[in-house]
Amino acid sequence: MSIEWYAVHTYVGQEDRVQDQLMDRARRLGMYRTKIFQVLQPEEEAVEIQEGGKKVNVKRKLFPGYVFVQMDVEDDDAPGELGESWEVVRGTSGVTGFVGTATRPVPLSPEEVQRLLTSVGVAAQPVVEEAPRIKVDLKAGDMVRVTSGPFADFSGVVSEVNAPQAKVKVLVSIFGRETPVELDFSQVAK
């Protein structure tokens, strides 16, 4: 796996649409955060003076006709060959090609990446994979004990489990009343 930044040609004025469509396609095809990581199109805020002297704040593209994609273009099964992610980017409506030769995109140099990320106010950082999902054997109606936080050592009944957020809602008896408390999975035990 070789994750690099690439400049992608687009039709001028289509940068926003290309960015949205590309991220949508990456998510739908299961490539987001595995093959296609980020799509950027640096902008700057400017003040334009219109007729009559009225000042208007506008966003202006720093690189009209380009978006920048952080991705792995190689085929996992054939190192050195271009993979499906390359086809996904090239096949996105509004994309006219990669910067490079007709058969091989050329990645940006580290200096170019640093300038690009600085222009959008992001420090260059290595890609961090998503944290693994925590699997917890909890369901509504389970009796649990709170192990940490302000309700430590209280017991309660699980009323709701939110697995994507790794949260659980527990009904804790406080002063004789059932009070819902939202906790992280790590704060409760059966």
Swiss-Prot record:
GO biological process, one term: DNA-templated transcription termination
Xref: PROSITE patterns: NUSG
UniProt xrefs under Pfam families: KOW (PF00467), NusG (PF02357)
Keyword Ribosomal protein: no
InterPro entries: KOW, NGN, NGN-like_dom, NGN_dom_sf, NusG-like, Rib_uL2_dom2, Transcrpt_antiterm_NusG, Transcrpt_antiterm_NusG_bac_CS
Family stated for the protein in its record: Belongs to the NusG family.
Protein's name according to its UniProt entry: Transcription termination/antitermination protein NusG
Species for this entry: Deinococcus radiodurans (strain ATCC 13939 / DSM 20539 / JCM 16871 / CCUG 27074 / LMG 4051 / NBRC 15346 / NCIMB 9279 / VKM B-1422 / R1)
